[in-house]
C-alpha cells in the first residue's frame, strides 16, 4: 500500500493533527518506510513460536473485586473541559 500526500492529509484531518503542507510529502515517505517494515515483519515465519504477552515472566498481584457505589460524577468531571449531566462531552471525530 503506497501512502501519498493526500492520504497523509486525510489521516491528519481525521486525527485532528495540524500538518503543514510542506511536511506532507516527508511524512508520506516516512509512513511508506514504516509500511515496508511492517510488510517485512508479515513475511517472518512464526509457525511454532508461542505468542508472548510480555517478555518478563512476572505475575501481577490480584485484588478482590469489591462493588462500590462509584465516584461522585461532579468530582470526576470537574477537570473536564466540558461535561453535561455527569458525562464527558467530546468533539465528534468520526464522519
UniProtKB/Swiss-Prot annotation:
Keyword ATP-binding: yes
E.C. number: 6.3.5.-
UniProt KW keywords: ATP-binding, Ligase, Nucleotide-binding, Protein biosynthesis
Keyword presence, NAD: no
A Pfam family hit: GatC
MF terms (GO), sorted A to Z: asparaginyl-tRNA synthase (glutamine-hydrolyzing) activity; ATP binding; glutaminyl-tRNA synthase (glutamine-hydrolyzing) activity
Enzyme class: ligase
GO process annotations (BP): glutaminyl-tRNAGln biosynthesis via transamidation; regulation of translational fidelity; translation
Catalysed reactions, as listed in the record: L-glutamyl-tRNA(Gln) + L-glutamine + ATP + H2O = L-glutaminyl-tRNA(Gln) + L-glutamate + ADP + phosphate + H(+); L-aspartyl-tRNA(Asn) + L-glutamine + ATP + H2O = L-asparaginyl-tRNA(Asn) + L-glutamate + ADP + phosphate + 2 H(+)
SUPFAM superfamilies: Glu-tRNAGln amidotransferase C subunit
Cross-referenced HAMAP family: GatC
Protein family membership: Belongs to the GatC family.
NCBIfam families attached to this UniProt entry: gatC
Subunit annotation: Heterotrimer of A, B and C subunits.
Function: Allows the formation of correctly charged Asn-tRNA(Asn) or Gln-tRNA(Gln) through the transamidation of misacylated Asp-tRNA(Asn) or Glu-tRNA(Gln) in organisms which lack either or both of asparaginyl-tRNA or glutaminyl-tRNA synthetases. The reaction takes place in the presence of glutamine and ATP through an activated phospho-Asp-tRNA(Asn) or phospho-Glu-tRNA(Gln).
Protein known as: Aspartyl/glutamyl-tRNA(Asn/Gln) amidotransferase subunit C
